[in-house]
Curated annotation (Swiss-Prot):
HAMAP family: UPF0434. The lineage of its organism: Bacteria, Pseudomonadati, Pseudomonadota, Alphaproteobacteria, Rickettsiales. This is UPF0434 protein Ecaj_0131. Pfam families: Trm112p. SUPFAM superfamilies: Trm112p-like.
C-alpha cells in the first residue's frame, strides 16, 4: 500500500504525467509511457531502468 499523498506528488520521470497505483502488483503505472515502477519496502523506485514495460 502506498500513501495517497505520495501519489499526488510523484509523476512519471519520462512523461511527467500522474501515476496510478496498482495494488495487485504493488507498482506505480504510467499509462502514457507504458511503464510500471516497482515499490520495494514501501519506497517507489522511480528509475526508468528499473521499470517494467507494459504490454500494448
Amino acid at each position: 500500500m502506498i500513501d495517497h499523498r505520495i501519489l499526488e506528488i510523484l509523476v512519471c520521470p519520462l512523461t511527467k504525467d500522474k501515476l496510478q497505483y496498482n495494488k495487485d502488483t504493488n507498482e506505480l503505472i504510467s499509462q502514457k509511457a507504458k511503464l510500471a515502477f516497482p515499490i520495494r519496502d514501501g519506497i517507489p523506485i522511480m528509475l526508468i531502468d528499473e521499470a517494467r514495460k507494459l504490454e500494448p
